[in-house]
Structure formats: C-alpha cells, structure tokens
C-alpha cells in the first residue's frame, strides 16, 4: 500500500493563478512554491544542477537526531546573521522558486543553532528537509532527509499543537518516511498522515494544498487491496474507506480555492472523472492540464499521464 503523499514540486508549485493566491494569503505564513517563468532556460537549469551536484556532504548531529545524517554544506562559507522575521521571509521567498529550494534549506541550516527553539523556524526547517527529500536522487539520502524532517515535525507539533503548518508538514514527512517501510509500518504512517492532515485542515481551512493531499489520500485508499484493508483493520480497529467520488471532491475544492493550482491536480481531476465515467469533465481537465507549463520532472510525468488519459478517452 502506497501512502506516500507525493508532495513534490508539481503538487505544491502552481500556475500564475497560484502566484496571485500566495500574494493574497501571505499572512498565513505558509509559502508554497510557485511556477517559474516559462522563459527559464534549460541551459541555466543544467548549470545550476551541475553546480549543486558538486556540493560536499558533511555529517551533523542535532538535538533532534539520534544518529548522524548527511546534510548539504552551505555554498557560502560566510553566514549573514539575520533576525527571525527577515530569515523566514527570505527562506519563504527563495522557496517560491522551484530551483532555489536548496538555497532556502541552506539558509535555514545556517541559522539552526540560533533559532532552533522557534516554532516558525522549526516547521519551516522540517519542510525544507522535505524539499531536500524531493531534490535528492539518492535513496539513502532521501531516507535521511525524511527521517530528520519527521523528527523536526514531531518537535513542532509537540510544542505547537494548534499550529496548522506543523501538522501539515508532519503529515507530509510521515508520507515520505513510509516509502522506506514495510506494509505494516506503511499502514501506520498512513493513519498518522490522515490524522494530522485532518487537523491541519481544521486549522487552515482555506489552504488548497491540504485538499490536494486529502484527495491523494482518498484516491489511494479507494484502491487498497483486501489484504491491505484487513491489516489496517487489525492495527486500528476499522477498515479505512474512501471513494473516487470523495477524492474528486477534494481535488475540485483545490480548484475552487485556487484555479490553476497545478498540472498534477488537473491530472487527478481527469483521472477521477474518467473513473466515474464523466467523460466530458475528464476531457476538460486534460485540456486545462496541458495549458500549464511543464517546469519540473513531476510536471513532465503528469503531462505524460494526461496524454495517456486523453488517448484512452478518444477510443
């Protein structure tokens, strides 16, 4: 059973409409990444990737870790001291650009000793480890980033149980950690994911990203095998249940709150509509998906899936 949330760049990065939404909702303190300009050149991306790949790894031990994990060493040896508000604003701003997430992580890393007890810093640092999980292509590194981020997330929700951002990113990181676990632990993390996602929605009811995640959860649960449902019932006393219709409603909620949220949200809208035999809607969502630029690998994967759906619908 795959409970991974797939909180990748294509899920939380959006179109021009998403940029407008973020400007309106900046006061929520949750800065989700936005689409880059379509004029960003492939050569620039390649150069940036090559430079990043040359970074040295160091080993760090923090009070949130029980073992050593590799983390990226900052590119700049000189660290500019920032106050908390300026630091958070700068980290959020960097993260809005898909190709500056690593720089945002480095900035937070450089200030972790100074602000390690500040809640607004902690949940962002946990989120940044989730970003590094997405950026890394090495399985062991991804596992390390997921585990550190989850530990930071636990610290955040313990200290600020009424902060929706803490619950959001803890849920996300539970999804990432679950990718390296067996079936029983996957089910356990899926349960935690749902629990904290629901709490985040209660605290942040207007945040579209949460409904995207809820849609993904519902879609995955609707496709559980009998043995997976049986094991979940054994662990938690009840069988998890959801439907494609419920998944569709959550993806539609995303579109209602922020039209053009992401290519992958349109892809799932098309998937759900096709499964429910709502052919006209499926075609519409495929067309809308193709109008959005494909910036990241996940965008390209979503576009490939949309093309397959379109081909199926034309038969």
Model regions: which residues?
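C-terminal transmembrane module of eukaryotic multi-pass membrane proteins
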Residues: 258-278, 282-286, 292
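Structural helix-adjacent loops and short alpha-helical linkers that scaffold large soluble proteins
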Residues: 140, 278-280, 297
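"A position-specific structural signal for the A-helix of alpha-solenoid helical repeats
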Residues: 82-90, 124, 128-131, 169, ...
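Boundary/linker segments of alpha-helical solenoid repeat arrays
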Residues: 119-120, 164-165, 208-209, 244, ...
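Short coil/linker segments at helix-helix boundaries
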Residues: 89-90, 94-103, 127-162, 168-206, ...
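Extreme N-terminal leader/anchor segments
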Residues: 1-120, 279, 283-293, 303-315
């Amino acid at each position: 059973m795959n409970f991974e949330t797939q909180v990748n760049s294509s899920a939380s990065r959006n179109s021009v409409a998403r940029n407008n939404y973020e400007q309106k909702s900046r006061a929520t303190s949750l800065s989700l990444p936005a689409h880059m300009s379509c004029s960003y050149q492939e050569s620039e991306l390649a150069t940036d990737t090559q430079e990043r790949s040359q970074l040295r790894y160091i080993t760090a031990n923090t009070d949130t870790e029980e073992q050593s994990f590799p983390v990226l060493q900052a590119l700049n040896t000189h660290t500019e001291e920032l106050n908390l508000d300026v630091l958070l604003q700068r980290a959020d701003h960097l993260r809005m650009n898909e190709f500056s997430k690593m720089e945002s992580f480095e900035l937070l890393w450089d200030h972790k000793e100074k602000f390690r007890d500040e809640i607004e810093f902690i949940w962002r640092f946990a989120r940044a480890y989730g970003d590094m999980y997405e950026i890394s292509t090495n399985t062991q590194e991804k596992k390390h980033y997921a585990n550190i981020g989850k530990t930071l997330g636990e610290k955040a929700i313990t200290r600020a149980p009424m902060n929706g951002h803490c619950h959001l990113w803890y849920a996300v990181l539970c999804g990432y950690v679950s990718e390296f676990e067996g079936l029983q632990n996957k089910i356990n993390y899926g349960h935690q994911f749902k629990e904290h996602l629901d709490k985040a929605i209660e605290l942040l009811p207007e945040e579209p990203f949460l409904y995207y995640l809820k849609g993904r959860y519902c879609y995955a649960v609707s496709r559980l095998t009998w043995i997976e449902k049986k094991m979940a019932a054994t662990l938690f006393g009840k069988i998890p249940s959801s439907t494609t219709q419920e998944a569709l409603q959550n993806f539609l909620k995303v579109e209602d709150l922020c039209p053009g949220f992401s290519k992958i949200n349109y892809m799932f809208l098309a998937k759900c509509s096709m499964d429910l035999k709502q052919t006209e809607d499926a075609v519409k969502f495929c067309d809308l998906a193709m109008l959005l630029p494909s910036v990241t690998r996940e965008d390209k994967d979503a576009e490939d899936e949309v093309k397959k759906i379109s081909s199926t619908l034309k038969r």
